[in-house]
Amino acid sequence: MLLAIDAGNTNIVFALVDGGAIVARWRIATDARRTADEYAVWLHQLLQLEGHDRSVIEAVIIATVVPRALHNLEVLASKYFGVEALVAGRPPVEWGITLDVDEPQNVGADRAVNVIAAHKRHPGDLILIDFGTATTFDVVDYSGAYKGGIIAPGINLSLDALVAAAAKLPRIAIEAPETSTVIGRTTQDQMLIGIYFGYVAMIEGLVARMKAEIGRPATVIATGGLATLFERHVKLFDSIEPDLTIQGLGIMYDRLKTGP
């Protein structure tokens, strides 16, 4: 099986992929100080819970936006699985897509991998929205070329900034409100409405502007760890695919094995 690793700013997702299907997935908080040995102990226990031995892992592929975490993940692959980790965007794991932007070298690995997965699954023009530490909007044309996008603070970052700057505001949990009312009657309700429905308005407004700029119908795909948070109140998503990055890593690995 393939061990696909998506190392983000907040969490690292490890997934077992077999024949394109995700067999198991686990999530751990990102900590660049965590050693290969610590990852190995954690993974060994989870593999056992799923009824697997570490010998089932035949290859490892990594996409990361946290450079300091990469070394120990590579050591994990070599020391405990006996393989050299493949790293998305680093030879021989080329993107296989056109990054049609002014600074292609600065496109995040997770965003490029998402483009690969989404284009294979959905022909035509696409808008990808990845809800994570940052909220990113990416435009992909019908040929599969990445045309650019938007980077905004993630919803939890916005809450953190608000609470840090306003001494009397309490820490609240971000969740989808039960109703669509935007007139809160308590401080906590008003904060949740402001953060949550402010994000809903941002999503709807930016997608409308992007569609107008594209000038053609575009499929809107939501992904990332927080994508389902907006499912109740955002009606413009054509598809919610939380595992898009892992699926993209699987596609890249298969392409490397079999050729384009």
UniProtKB/Swiss-Prot annotation:
It comes from the Bacteria. K(+) binds at residue 130. GO terms for cellular component: cytoplasm. ATP binds at residues 6-13, 133. Pathway: Cofactor biosynthesis; coenzyme A biosynthesis; CoA from (R)-pantothenate: step 1/5. Substrate binds at residues 108-111, 187. GO terms for biological process: coenzyme A biosynthetic process. InterPro entries: ATPase_NBD (IPR043129), Type_III_PanK (IPR004619). The active site is at 110 (proton acceptor). The keyword Ribonucleoprotein does not apply. Keywords: ATP-binding, Coenzyme A biosynthesis, Cytoplasm, Kinase, Metal-binding, Nucleotide-binding, Potassium, Transferase. It catalyses: (R)-pantothenate + ATP = (R)-4'-phosphopantothenate + ADP + H(+). Pfam families: Pan_kinase (PF03309). Its cofactor is NH4(+); K(+). PANTHER family: TYPE III PANTOTHENATE KINASE. Belongs to the type III pantothenate kinase family. Catalyzes the phosphorylation of pantothenate (Pan), the first step in CoA biosynthesis. Homodimer. This is Type III pantothenate kinase. It comes from Rhizorhabdus wittichii (strain DSM 6014 / CCUG 31198 / JCM 15750 / NBRC 105917 / EY 4224 / RW1).
